[in-house]
Amino acid sequence: MAAEEKDPLSYFAAYGSSSSDSESSDEEKEAERSKNRSIKRPFPTDTKKLPGPDELFRNVSRPAFLYNPLNKQIDWESRVKRAPEEPPKEFKVWKTNAVPPPESYQVAEKKAPPPELDMAIKWSNVYQDNGDDAPHANQAKSLEEEEAREDSPPSDDEQEKAFAIKKRKV
């Protein structure tokens, strides 16, 4: 029965190899594995490893071009490269149709509309109703003048004119 049982990982094994081979021994398998390991390593183990950081910084010196011979310090000011300065740009106001903020907003003063005729006068002219009772634009009077006339007694000429006008209406 042992020969009939299969290794569950044998499905993933390479083609043509089987785990049920009883011919190969454990020693032979270990020999093959050691050969495969030696083939996978590209670098031989005899090479020297890189030095550690402490050892490296003890041995490495700074390049001579960074030093000022008088001070023995790095002259960073002579090494600095600065971009050329551009002239300041002029501020240009964008032209938009947006409503300006309330602080800068000034109401544009509009011209007053032309004085319109009284609608009664306009309609009487349209329909040519220019009788005695038709309104006239030039007869507009202020209240002060009317009050002054009411206070004073009417003269004879004014009474006759008023009487003649009343006769015409009737």
Curated annotation (Swiss-Prot):
TM regions (residue ranges): none
InterPro entries associated with the record: DUF4660
UniProt feature, compositional bias: Acidic residues: 144-159
Listed Basic and acidic residues bias regions: 46-56
Stretch list, region Disordered: 1-56, 124-170
One matching Pfam family: DUF4660
Family of this protein: Belongs to the UPF0690 family.
Name of the protein: UPF0690 protein C1orf52 homolog
Native source species: Xenopus tropicalis (Western clawed frog)
